[in-house]
């Protein structure tokens, strides 16, 4: 089992913040708490860590602004509250992060943005670009248009999907409880706190309770569901209390929290998903030079593609076939079939002139590709030969 490590040793962290932490039912936004939270985020970024925030609170904040009554809201009421609250929430994050000269970027997702491959790739590219320029993506479900049939249902699971989408190696769920207990502690005074969870078993799932606040849709059950999504994709998860000011600093200073161990690594888990669960929609036939490049761990460029077969869309899975007619790799293609045919055999610098838009340099990026066992073995032999040369 992978051991727990300090936050500073992670590469990319997704932080989910519950509504009850950000919004007081009567007083509205908890500005002082948010400022302290953003100072924590600035501290992580100063250490070179990518930080993404999945922030609940739009409906809760809009509810406060509109002075809606307590209790369950009708769908149209919650969507109206989200429309009002999302503006205020984005402004609050932007203002607090700007205190440390950090730019915030708002992203509102719906279920299809992570479940449909084409939209998934587009959302991931946008998030990665924000991280590349040093911004902090502030992500929330688009509650104004989401319905009960087409929604994540809670931001715990949304945060887990964002973590897997972006290859994060840590997901932190901040809530009004400090971690996982063997039973709901407010119901069972003898409940035992669990500091480390090596694997999410049926017994672990049975320990989850329900939501504790009208401002929040989630509860321990949704956090365990999020843990299953994250850990099986190679991402560790922490459940911790967000009640103290500077909750991330509190975690670093030893505050009690539950740590869920990952299985594998984010890249390994995603490549297993590509190789084993998706059927190729087409084929890219490549030359010997491309085979050598892929064996060295590089992306597939249009120049190495000899021909294209099949009908596919950007984001679909395609098989990469070598000169001998054998599949040597499989991956998510960056272009529709028609455009792929037009740029096959051409240099990446020519793409914009041919297609009329600046597409991606790689036909299949190495992060979206898994090599066949045969090519992996050949690559390993080449590395060993080079080492002994």
UniProtKB/Swiss-Prot annotation:
Highest taxon in the source lineage: Bacteria
Catalytic reactions on record: L-glutamate + ATP = L-glutamyl 5-phosphate + ADP
Annotated ATP binding sites: 16, 175-176
Record localization: Cytoplasm
UniProt key word Cell cycle: no
A GO term, aspect molecular function: glutamate 5-kinase activity
Domain PUA: 281-358
E.C. number: 2.7.2.11
Top-rank EC class of the record's enzyme: transferase
GO BP: L-proline biosynthetic process
Keyword annotations from UniProtKB, A to Z: Amino-acid biosynthesis, ATP-binding, Cytoplasm, Kinase, Nucleotide-binding, Proline biosynthesis, Transferase
UniProt-listed Pfam families: AA_kinase, PUA
Pathway assigned to this chain's UniProt record: Amino-acid biosynthesis; L-proline biosynthesis; L-glutamate 5-semialdehyde from L-glutamate: step 1/2
Signal peptide residue numbers: none
Function: Catalyzes the transfer of a phosphate group to glutamate to form L-glutamate 5-phosphate.
Family the entry assigns: Belongs to the glutamate 5-kinase family.
NCBIfam families: proB
Name of the molecule in the record: Glutamate 5-kinase
Annotated source species: Rhizobium etli (strain CIAT 652)
């Amino acid at each position: 089992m992978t051991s727990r490590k300090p936050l500073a040793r992670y590469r990319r962290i997704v932080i989910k913040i519950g509504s009850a932490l950000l919004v007081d039912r009567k007083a509205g936004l908890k500005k002082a708490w948010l400022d302290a939270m953003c100072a924590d985020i600035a501290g992580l970024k100063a250490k070179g860590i990518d930080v993404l925030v999945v922030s609940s609170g739009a409906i809760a904040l809009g509810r406060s602004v509109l002075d809606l009554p307590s209790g369950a809201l009708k769908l149209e009421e919650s969507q109206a509250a989200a429309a009002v609250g999302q503006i205020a929430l984005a402004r609050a994050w932007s203002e607090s992060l700007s205190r440390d000269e950090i730019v915030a970027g708002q992203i509102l997702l719906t279920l299809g943005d992570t479940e449909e491959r084409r939209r998934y790739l587009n959302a991931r590219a946008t998030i990665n670009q924000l991280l590349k320029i040093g911004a902090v993506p502030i992500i929330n479900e688009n509650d104004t248009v989401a319905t009960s049939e087409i929604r994540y249902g809670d931001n715990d699971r949304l945060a887990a999907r964002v973590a897997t989408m972006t290859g994060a190696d840590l997901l932190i769920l901040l809530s009004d409880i400090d971690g996982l207990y063997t039973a709901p502690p407010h119901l069972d005074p003898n409940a035992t706190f669990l500091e480390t969870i090596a694997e999410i078993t049926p017994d672990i799932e049975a320990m989850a309770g329900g939501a504790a606040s009208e401002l929040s849709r989630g509860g321990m059950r949704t956090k365990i569901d999020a843990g299953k999504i994250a850990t099986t994709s190679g991402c560790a998860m922490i459940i911790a209390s967000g009640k103290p000011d500077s909750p991330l600093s509190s975690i670093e200073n030893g505050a009690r929290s539950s740590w869920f161990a990952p299985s594998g690594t984010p890249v390994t888990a995603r490549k297993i998903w590509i190789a084993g669960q998706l059927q190729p929609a087409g084929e890219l036939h490549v030359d010997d030079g491309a085979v050598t490049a892929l064996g060295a761990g590089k992306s597939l460029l249009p120049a190495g593609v000899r021909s294209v077969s099949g009908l596919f869309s950007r984001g679909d899975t395609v098989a990469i076939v070598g000169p001998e007619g054998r599949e040597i790799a499989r991956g998510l293609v960056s272009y529709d079939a028609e455009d792929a045919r037009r740029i096959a055999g051409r240099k990446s610098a020519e793409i914009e002139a041919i297609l009329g838009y600046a597409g991606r340099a790689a036909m299949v990026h190495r992060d979206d590709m898994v090599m066949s066992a045969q090519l992996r073995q050949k690559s390993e032999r080449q590395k060993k030969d080079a080492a002994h040369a």
